[in-house]
Amino acid sequence: VRYSNTYYFYRLGWTGLNVDALPGTANLFRRMRPKDITVECGIGAKEGFLTYFAFNDPALNTFSAQEAERKNHPPYHVVNKVQLPVMTLAKLLDQQLPKGMAIDFMTVDTEGLDHDVIASNDWDRYRPKVVLVELLNTGIADLPSNPTARLLQGQRYQLYAKTCNTFFFVAQEAAHRWNVQSA
């Protein structure tokens, strides 16, 4: 539950869909969050296989070779590289999201491939009210040139808040209903 953006909500009674590529993680999720749906797979721009870089601190694990290289310095180091299957977010939601269930809250934190995950969604069919996305090395002033922020804004999401590396975007229709102002 360390660094979890969703465990607090689970403890309040919310349920959801957990996705983690780290082999063996699904068992831990199922034990800690038995009411949730848990899937052990990677999400990417297209179906296939990607190299997964596992670190001595799992919070740094990534499919991004660039992020792995950037973080592979003491006290952290890559302990394993493995080819893992990945699918698009839209396909995962097609397979796992119960029919008729709306997504209120989605958090994407993939250590460097967040844009690929966001871009692989079908935003007409799967439209979370709130999207949290990690944008590494990005400040609010950088958003106009950030491809992930531009993609979300093009899908009618507006920035609401930012913490460290995580940006909170709210669907415009939800923001209007909730009387939420842009950041």
Describe each region flagged by the PLM.
Residues V1-A183:
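Phosphate/nucleotide-binding beta-alpha loop and adjacent structural elements of enzyme active sites
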